[in-house]
From Swiss-Prot:
<keyword id="KW-0443">Lipid metabolism</keyword>
<keyword id="KW-0547">Nucleotide-binding</keyword>
<keyword id="KW-0418">Kinase</keyword>
<comment type="pathway">
    <text>Glycolipid biosynthesis; lipid IV(A) biosynthesis; lipid IV(A) from (3R)-3-hydroxytetradecanoyl-[acyl-carrier-protein] and UDP-N-acetyl-alpha-D-glucosamine: step 6/6.</text>
</comment>
<keyword id="KW-0067">ATP-binding</keyword>
<feature type="region of interest" description="Disordered">
    <location>
        <begin position="78"/>
        <end position="106"/>
    </location>
</feature>
<keyword id="KW-0441">Lipid A biosynthesis</keyword>
<dbReference type="InterPro" id="IPR003758">
    <property type="entry name" value="LpxK"/>
</dbReference>
<dbReference type="GO" id="GO:0009245">
    <property type="term" value="P:lipid A biosynthetic process"/>
</dbReference>
<feature type="binding site">
    <location>
        <begin position="54"/>
        <end position="61"/>
    </location>
    <ligand>
        <name>ATP</name>
    </ligand>
</feature>
<dbReference type="InterPro" id="IPR027417">
    <property type="entry name" value="P-loop_NTPase"/>
</dbReference>
<comment type="function">
    <text>Transfers the gamma-phosphate of ATP to the 4'-position of a tetraacyldisaccharide 1-phosphate intermediate (termed DS-1-P) to form tetraacyldisaccharide 1,4'-bis-phosphate (lipid IVA).</text>
</comment>
<dbReference type="GO" id="GO:0009244">
    <property type="term" value="P:lipopolysaccharide core region biosynthetic process"/>
</dbReference>
<keyword id="KW-0808">Transferase</keyword>
<dbReference type="GO" id="GO:0005886">
    <property type="term" value="C:plasma membrane"/>
</dbReference>
<dbReference type="Pfam" id="PF02606">
    <property type="entry name" value="LpxK"/>
</dbReference>
<keyword id="KW-0444">Lipid biosynthesis</keyword>
Amino acid sequence: MTRRPPRFWLRPTRSIAARLLRPFSFIATTLTRRRLRQPTFHASVPVLCCGNITTGGTGKTPLTLDLVQRLRDRGHHPHILSRGHGGRERGPIGVNPNRSTPRDVGDEPLLLAQSAPTWIGADRAETARLAISQGADCLVMDDGFQNPTLHQDVSVLVVDGVTGFGNGCVLPAGPLREPVPDALARAQAVVVMGDDRHNLIPTFPPHLLTAQARLVPGPEIRTLQGRRIVAFAGIGRPEKFFDMLRDAGVAPIRSLPFPDHHFYTPRDIQRLEALSRESGTTLVTTAKDAVKLPFPFRTQVKVIGVELLWADPKSPERLLDLLFSAS
């Protein structure tokens, strides 16, 4: 049901397949470096980017939401910029959480728009100008680490602590969008999500602000204790959501992974409803998936939000201090 990455991408040693594909990785790296040398627009307000260099989910959207809320708590008026992956609109346009649809603007922007004004557009510079004209005093980019059109005062590289950088190779030989040294040279901070199983943190350059955090379910998880649930998710790494439920003591009797940014079809909905009726269970999904579910089916599904738990509570505040000192 999901498109799983090749196994050799995640092996610590480079396989024969990876070695055979390396010439194509060299071409991809050359093109990326050339694109990153394009002229950059400097916005009149601070710009923070939460991005990654691997395919699949790393937790950058929960990080974006966490930092946006902290900016609001400081009295700022942050606006969020997103590419709008999966949507038809090219932008720049504002996302209306009550009127915009996932097929128009994408699923992540709809989720982000529930927390702060959110704009989508392929041209980040043009989108930034529009957001600033509408009152933004700082901008937070959800993804866009490899987008050169808008200068980033602070670039935060988000790394999954379990998978790390995989086999260390660039697409298609590995999961990376660019070489790790290139990314670290542009970043000002690195946030490792989850256990640092590859002991990456000590290897990062000392000038980078490094932090560690993990994703935990929201308080609504308590209502599921002792209940039989069927969990489904169409995110970058659905198994992370299922594992999070198990760690919270809510083990699904069945887990259904869907591709990232998946649009649920009538057939999908019928299947999920049938599973719920047959087993007498509660359907559970993510907030990102919930925005794509049609009414009234959405009311039949329990939505579990995700929160960020920082290893050092001072880390996010240091990151925001860095943003305003750099701009």
